[in-house]
């Protein structure tokens, strides 16, 4: 089960962590937290996200190397603006049909729902408050595909630098 957790973590936040240093979800505004919780994961968004991960792959070496530096914004919009500040990121995401904000929103929703899927698999596990079972089911349905994406983004994880 821990391997599933690690893969989920890598797939959803590795790129953002590499760009932003550790941005902690609880530091987001209430509006951002609610937006992430209310986001509906879809096949169309996953297709764009998959394309985005592949388009961002060549940019991994351009990412900031200081993972301990805390320059991250405390909002979804601020974090997206920081991503857009990395040369080539905005264009790569646009070519995949996403904005940096959409990429982050999908990523963090995926992370949240992956964690919920993991929690439900634990003895006595219950669906966390505010988490949609439809999103957990989406995550479970696409788990193999997400693991493959996780391998692509693994090198950007601060723990792997």
Residues of each region from the PLM?
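Compact alpha-helical subdomains of small soluble proteins
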Residues: 72-161
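Immediate post-signal-peptide N-terminus of mature secreted/exported proteins
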Residues: 25-72, 148-161
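Sec/Tat signal peptide C-region and signal peptidase I cleavage site
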Residues: 19-25
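Bacterial N-terminal signal peptides
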Residues: 10-19
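Bacterial N-terminal signal peptides that target proteins for export
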Residues: 1-10
């Amino acid at each position: 089960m821990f391997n599933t957790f690690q893969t989920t973590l890598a797939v959803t936040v590795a790129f953002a962590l590499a760009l932003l240093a550790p941005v902690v979800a609880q530091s987001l505004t209430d509006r951002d937290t609610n937006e992430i919780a209310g986001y509906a994961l879809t096949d169309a968004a996953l297709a764009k996200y998959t394309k985005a991960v592949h388009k961002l792959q060549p940019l991994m070496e351009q990412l900031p190397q200081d993972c301990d530096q805390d320059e991250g914004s405390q909002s979804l919009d601020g974090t997206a603006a920081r991503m857009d500040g990395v040369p080539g990121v905005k264009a790569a995401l646009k070519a995949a049909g996403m904005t940096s904000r959409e990429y982050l929103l999908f990523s963090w929703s995926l992370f949240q729902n992956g964690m919920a899927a993991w929690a439900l698999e634990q003895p006595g596990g219950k669906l966390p408050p505010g988490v949609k079972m439809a999103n957990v089911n989406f995550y479970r349905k696409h788990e193999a595909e997400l693991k493959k994406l996780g391998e692509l983004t693994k090198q950007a994880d601060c723990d792997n630098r």
